């Protein structure tokens, strides 16, 4: 099979990549963060390339994509592609919540209720969970139905993360 050469010059691009990770990262290099480019981060992180996904999600989050903010929180909260950083994870959740994202509201509500990455505030945390539930987020409704028992929505394998540090 012959190698295809891509040439960029003042007249345009000969044989441009029109799909795949090459296009995604060329888009990022050129400051293009569209929904298709940002959604590719899911496949990248699920393939175990967390540092690469982190680069993509961070650019998309900075461009205002709340789904990418949620993914940045997940990466920081689990030490994927970087250090475990609950403060950074909570900050991404807060940004998504402030942007009006129901998942961001739910996640930041959990952060506040647990005091994970932020100062604990049960009242504000419940209020955010309630907003997410009102907006139709089923897991938020489930937490309300369990009288805000966090074990309802959190695997017990994660309990070590949420234990007090003192």
Over which residues does each language-model region extend?
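Alpha-helical segment of the N-proximal tetratricopeptide repeat
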Residues: 30-59, 63
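Hydrophobic face of amphipathic alpha-helices that form TPR/SEL1-like repeat modules
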Residues: 37-44, 69-78, 105-114, 143-150
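Long, contiguous interaction/recruitment modules in multidomain scaffold/adaptor proteins
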Residues: 1-28
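Terminal, low-structured helical/coil segments at or just beyond the last alpha-helical repeat
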Residues: 133, 139-166
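Structural signature of tandem alpha-helical TPR/SEL1-like repeats
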Residues: 14-19, 46-55, 82-92, 119-128, ...
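Residue-level recognition of tetratricopeptide repeat
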Residues: 65-67, 101, 137-139
